[in-house]
């Protein structure tokens, strides 16, 4: 799980320009001041990195770093 978390964290840090220390399993994208465009770009980056497809209705449910990691783990 930590390798998925590390990859997700790296993508979030790169896409949102936040410090690594700000990104934990409990951090919400709202906490990182991500707007709807940021979320779309993050979902696209996660889909590319993990070679999965995240339907819009699932993407709307992914609110935290931890929920993104869990989703990827379940759908890889």
UniProtKB/Swiss-Prot annotation:
Pathway the protein contributes to: Lipid metabolism; fatty acid biosynthesis
Record key words, sorted: Cytoplasm, Fatty acid biosynthesis, Fatty acid metabolism, Lipid biosynthesis, Lipid metabolism, Phosphopantetheine, Phosphoprotein
S-S bonds: none
One GO term of the biological process aspect: lipid A biosynthetic process
PROSITE patterns: CARRIER, PHOSPHOPANTETHEINE
Predominant location: cytoplasm
GO cellular component, one term: membrane
Ranges for domain Carrier: 2-76
MF terms (GO), sorted A to Z: acyl binding; acyl carrier activity; phosphopantetheine binding
Function, as annotated: Carrier of the growing fatty acid chain in fatty acid biosynthesis.
Entry-linked NCBIfam families: acyl_carrier, PRK00982.1-2, PRK00982.1-3, PRK00982.1-4, PRK00982.1-5
Name of the protein described by the UniProt record: Acyl carrier protein
Gene: acpP
């Amino acid at each position: 799980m930590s390798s998925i978390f590390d990859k997700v964290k790296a993508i979030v840090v790169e896409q949102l320009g936040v410090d690594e220390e700000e990104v934990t399993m409990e951090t919400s994208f709202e906490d990182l001041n991500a707007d709807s465009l940021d979320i779309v770009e993050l979902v696209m980056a996660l889909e590319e990195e993990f070679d999965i497809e995240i339907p819009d209705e699932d993407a709307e449910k992914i609110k935290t770093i931890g929920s993104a990691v869990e989703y990827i783990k379940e759908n890889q």
